C-alpha cells in the first residue's frame, strides 16, 4: 500500500518534560490507524504536533511525499490533514449547518472584497458551500438538526458535528482524538459504522481512543505509546499479545504527558 503519512523521529519537550521521544510511524492510504496508550502517554501531544498546534523539537512529518509545515495549523489543514478534539471545540452559538460551512471555507476562493460585495462568483460559492454542508450533516446522520444551535445538540451529536466540520475541509487524513469519549454503547456502534463509511469513501483515519474494544475491532494497524515512546506497532491481534503493551497498561503511574 502507498504511504500517506510518515512520522520521522518526532520529539517534543515542555521544559524538562520529554513528552515525545523519537516517535516514528507510517500510515498507509486507506487504512484506519489506531494510536493508543495509557493516560499521559503522549497521544494528544502527537496529534498537536502533527496538526501544527505545536512545533516539534525533533523530527518531521512527511505527508504525500512533502514535509508538513510545523506550527501552522491552517497550512496543515490546507495540505489535507483535519482533526477533531478530545474536548469538543464547536462554534457553540452557531447552527450545525453554519459550523460545517465554516470548515468548508478553507476550500473556497472568495476573498474579503468578494464577501463584502457579494459578487456573482461569491454568491454561487456560498450556495455550493451551504449545499455541501447539508450533505455532510446528512452523511453523519444529523441533518435534522441543521438549524439547531450547536450547544443544544446532544453530546454524541456534537461529536458527529465536529466530524462533519472536519470532513468539510476535504481531508485526505482525518485525525480523531477520542471520538467515542462520553458516548453510550449505541452511539459507539454508530461511530464505528461512520468511521468505516469514511474509510470506505477513501479517507484515511488516524484514531486516538481509550475504548480498546473499538480500536481492536476497527483499526487495520495500531501503534502504542508509553511515556512518549512508541513501544509497539502491529495489527491489533499482535498488539493485544505484546508483553510491553500489557505491562504499560497494568503498570500505572502515567500522569505527565497527554
List PLM regions with ranges.
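Glycine-rich phosphate-binding loops of nucleotide-dependent enzymes
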Residues: 1-258
Amino acid at each position: 500500500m502507498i504511504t500517506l503519512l510518515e512520522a520521522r523521529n518526532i520529539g517534543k519537550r515542555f521544559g524538562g518534560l520529554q513528552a515525545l521521544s523519537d516517535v516514528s510511524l507510517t500510515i498507509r492510504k486507506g487504512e484506519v490507524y489506531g494510536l493508543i496508550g495509557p493516560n499521559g502517554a503522549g497521544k494528544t501531544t502527537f496529534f498537536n504536533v502533527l496538526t501544527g498546534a505545536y512545533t516539534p523539537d525533533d523530527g518531521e512529518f512527511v505527508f504525500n511525499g512533502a514535509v508538513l509545515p510545523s506550527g501552522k495549523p491552517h497550512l496543515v489543514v490546507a495540505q489535507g490533514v483535519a482533526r477533531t478534539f478530545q474536548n469538543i471545540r464547536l462554534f457553540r452559538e452557531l447552527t450545525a449547518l453554519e459550523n460545517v460551512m465554516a470548515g468548508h471555507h478553507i476550500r473556497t476562493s472568495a476573498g474579503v472584497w468578494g464577501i463584502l460585495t457579494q459578487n456573482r462568483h461569491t454568491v454561487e460559492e456560498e450556495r455550493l458551500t451551504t449545499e455541501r454542508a447539508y450533505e455532510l450533516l446528512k452523511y453523519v446522520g444529523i441533518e435534522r438538526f441543521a438549524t439547531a444551535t450547536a450547544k443544544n445538540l446532544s453530546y454524541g451529536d456534537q461529536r458527529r458535528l465536529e466530524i462533519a466540520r472536519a470532513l468539510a475541509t476535504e481531508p485526505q487524513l482525518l485525525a480523531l482524538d477520542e471520538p467515542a469519549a462520553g458516548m453510550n454503547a449505541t452511539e459507539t456502534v454508530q461511530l464505528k459504522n461512520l468511521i468505516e463509511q469514511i474509510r470506505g469513501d477513501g479517507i484515511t483515519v488516524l484514531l486516538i481512543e481509550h475504548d480498546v474494544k473499538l480500536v481492536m475491532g476497527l483499526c487495520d494497524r495500531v501503534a502504542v505509546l508509553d511515556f512518549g515512546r512508541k513501544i509497539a506497532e502491529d495489527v491489533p491481534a499482535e498488539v493485544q499479545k505484546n508483553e510491553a503493551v500489557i505491562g504499560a497498561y497494568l503498570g500505572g503511574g502515567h500522569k505527565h504527558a497527554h
